[in-house]
Amino acid sequence: MPKVTKIEVQKKNKERFNLYLDESFEMGIDMDTLVHFNLKKGDVLTAANMEDIQKYEHFRFGLHLAIQYLSYRKRTEQEVVQHLQKHEISESAIAEVIDYCNREGYIDHEDYAESLKNTMIRTTDKGPEIFRQKLIKAGIEKSLVENYTAKYEEEQPLEDVEILADKLLHQKKGPKKKRIDKVKQSLLQKGYSFEVINEAMQNLDFEPDSEEIDLLLQRELEKVFRKYERKYEGRQLEMKTIEALLRKGYEYDTIKDKMRESGIGDE
């Protein structure tokens, strides 16, 4: 059976040691492994002893990777598992690492959800649904997802949504109905519910500048008319033009007035 003939501190890492058996380098181990097995010069190690040491050292290596990964920011159990799998840590060692991290508080899903909630409310314009999706993607338990999504909805100031809606409103062009639809769609994509969107939009002024709308309608009319005059003529051309402008959100009477003004359709 092999005997421990030397244990020396590694030159580049004072917390790791080189283990020599029968004058030959066997493996590197960390301080915890050294202490855990009470290794010292002269120890005789069986095959079973070596297997235990190797397994424990593999666990310690995985734990080192996990703690280093967790040092940059909060992580979920799923994220840590995936990180360790990329480094080819065995499933049994991963299970031990995760158990240790949960027990010692390195992984805390409630703390993760709370921190993400506060950060997103404070620094982003995203609504509760985007927050929910992020928690699900990170592997947070369903009960916590529902609990913290509800907290997100309660704590996000309606004023922030109103400011965002007003900002979006000023970015949208076109008739009133079209602008309303565009703002609602943008807010839905950012993760807000219909209820919150409707409440936030109650006091917004969607009435566009009349001169701006007149100019936009004139441009749309010319564009649509040129498109359809290649295929249609007469009454059919007029109806196709009106239908296209109605789909864009313009009022029927406004369209007819602009067409007459432009010399298109009925006089």
UniProtKB/Swiss-Prot annotation:
<dbReference type="InterPro" id="IPR053926">
    <property type="entry name" value="RecX_HTH_1st"/>
</dbReference>
<comment type="similarity">
    <text>Belongs to the RecX family.</text>
</comment>
<dbReference type="InterPro" id="IPR003783">
    <property type="entry name" value="Regulatory_RecX"/>
</dbReference>
<comment type="function">
    <text>Modulates RecA activity.</text>
</comment>
<dbReference type="Pfam" id="PF21981">
    <property type="entry name" value="RecX_HTH3"/>
</dbReference>
<dbReference type="Pfam" id="PF21982">
    <property type="entry name" value="RecX_HTH1"/>
</dbReference>
<dbReference type="InterPro" id="IPR053925">
    <property type="entry name" value="RecX_HTH_3rd"/>
</dbReference>
<dbReference type="InterPro" id="IPR036388">
    <property type="entry name" value="WH-like_DNA-bd_sf"/>
</dbReference>
<dbReference type="GO" id="GO:0005737">
    <property type="term" value="C:cytoplasm"/>
</dbReference>
<keyword id="KW-0963">Cytoplasm</keyword>
<protein>
    <recommendedName>
        <fullName>Regulatory protein RecX</fullName>
    </recommendedName>
</protein>
<dbReference type="GO" id="GO:0006282">
    <property type="term" value="P:regulation of DNA repair"/>
</dbReference>
